Amino acid sequence: MIDNLIKRTPEINRLLENKRVTGVVTFVNPYSYYKIKEYNKISQLDYIYIDGILLLKLFNFVNGTKIKRHSFDYSSIAKTVFNYSIQNKMKIGLIGSKDYEIEQAVKNIRKKHPGIDISYFHSGYFSSLEEKSSVIDSVIKKSDIIICGLGTPAQEELALDIKIKSNEHLIFTCGGFFTQTASRADFYYPWIKRYNLMWLQRIVLYKHVRKRFFIDYPKFIVRFISENLMKIFTRSN
């Protein structure tokens, strides 16, 4: 199911051509691909993009597709989504990261996008189910576009909880975007984006990314290739 969802997800500009588009938009990389594939609510997700050059190249090779990379950050679609919200006078709600990180991220986003209407924001931590429910009710009431950054699968779970209560919102997951944007308004250096080396900058800065890159990613490569040997063999013949 995950591969079909990826294949039928339109590029972001095409998706946003529909001013009334709603649903949950999420992203997969070598770390999260199998987490989402085995997620028991995957059928409730509406759009899945590939974030990560490694997975992108493997996926396109195995499936004979020409899918492009999409990620919710300033190397990819974040600017597009924020500008879309400004042009269409839509309110933005943000949920994720720690209190001080989301507050600083909001400041940096507002500085980078004059005119943006961030009408609600909250950390990704909830003291109780009652608080989580209250946050969901508030972000639904105050926002048109909602962006959740809690890591996989917590962010997908939150996005679907929001969707269950309201099917009138466009909901994106964004991974570590708020944490990154709290440190720099445009987290990735220009030359990093130019050469698609976002993974390298994250490896240098974050210990958990180094673990994923050197331990989890090799496991992913072996599993992905072994599970798709028949497709690879068929394509080569």
Swiss-Prot record:
UniProt effect for mutating K211A: Abolishes catalytic activity
Ranges annotated as spanning the membrane: none
Protein name (record): UDP-Gal:alpha-D-GlcNAc-diphosphoundecaprenol beta-1,4-galactosyltransferase
GO MF terms held by the record: beta-N-acetylglucosaminylglycopeptide beta-1,4-galactosyltransferase activity; hexosyltransferase activity
Main function: Galactosyltransferase that adds one galactose residue in the beta-1-4 linkage to GlcNAc-alpha-pyrophosphate-lipid in the biosynthesis of the O-polysaccharide repeating unit of the O antigen.
CDD domains membership: Glyco_transf_WecG_TagA
Documented EC number(s): 2.4.1.304
Source species: Shigella boydii
Catalysis: reaction(s): N-acetyl-alpha-D-glucosaminyl-di-trans,octa-cis-undecaprenyl diphosphate + UDP-alpha-D-galactose = beta-D-Gal-(1->4)-alpha-D-GlcNAc-di-trans,octa-cis-undecaprenyl diphosphate + UDP + H(+)
Family as reported in the entry's similarity comment: Belongs to the glycosyltransferase 26 family.
Result of changing D99A: Does not affect catalytic activity
Essential cofactor(s): Mn(2+); Ni(2+); Pb(2+)
